[in-house]
């Protein structure tokens, strides 16, 4: 649609948008993709729970980089943090994740950050750190994922937990810190 109208449109491509029937079709297709992703996450969890013989006490999902069509909020780099909503904010492979409850803060667009945030780009991290440094940082956590292809995900490439916890208080209550005992991240050679 954009290419057909681009010759006559005063809107730059980087600011192009859809409306009307095209917008409705986009939302329809996006909902299908989001539903598929949710079912895929559930299938993975069901397999792990069954294989490990776990008993599920509480279950919820946290997604990022999506359109919340119920509230018409575009979340890029953020997750929903409605009042009372359970959510997870991952920090890094070493330090784990924050288990939180949303406060529904309108000043934060009823959202929270979807993670710690990078201190540097993926390519910069691969140049700045070594696999040896990465292995040392992951001491005490079982992982087969430390290697050159996952160096961009090393803990040193992300902001620290204290930086995040100290800044998200208006959006969420931090209920617990989940520390990893096992970590898996697919890489190029996996």
Q: Each PLM stretch: what is its role?
A:
Residues 3-190:
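Domain-length cofactor-binding catalytic modules of enzymes
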């Amino acid at each position: 649609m954009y290419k057909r109208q681009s010759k006559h449109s005063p809107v730059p491509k980087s600011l192009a948008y859809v409306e009307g029937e095209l917008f409705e079709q986009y939302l329809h297709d996006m909902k299908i993709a989001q539903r598929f992703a949710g079912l895929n996450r559930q299938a993975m969890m069901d397999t792990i729970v069954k294989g490990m013989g776990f008993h599920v006490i509480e279950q919820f999902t946290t997604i990022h980089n999506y359109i919340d069509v119920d509230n018409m909020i575009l979340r890029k780099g953020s997750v929903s943090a409605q009042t009372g909503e359970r959510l997870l904010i991952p920090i890094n492979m070493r330090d784990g994740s924050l288990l939180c409850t949303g406060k529904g803060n309108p000043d934060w667009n009823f959202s929270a950050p979807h993670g710690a945030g990078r201190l540097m780009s993926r390519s910069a991290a691969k140049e700045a750190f070594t696999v040896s440094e990465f292995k040392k940082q992951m001491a005490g956590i079982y992982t087969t994922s430390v290697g050159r292809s996952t160096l961009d995900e090393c803990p040193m490439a992300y902001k620290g937990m204290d930086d995040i916890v100290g800044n998200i208080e208006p959006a969420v209550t931090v209920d617990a810190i989940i520390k990893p005992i096992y970590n898996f991240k697919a890489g190029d050679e996996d």
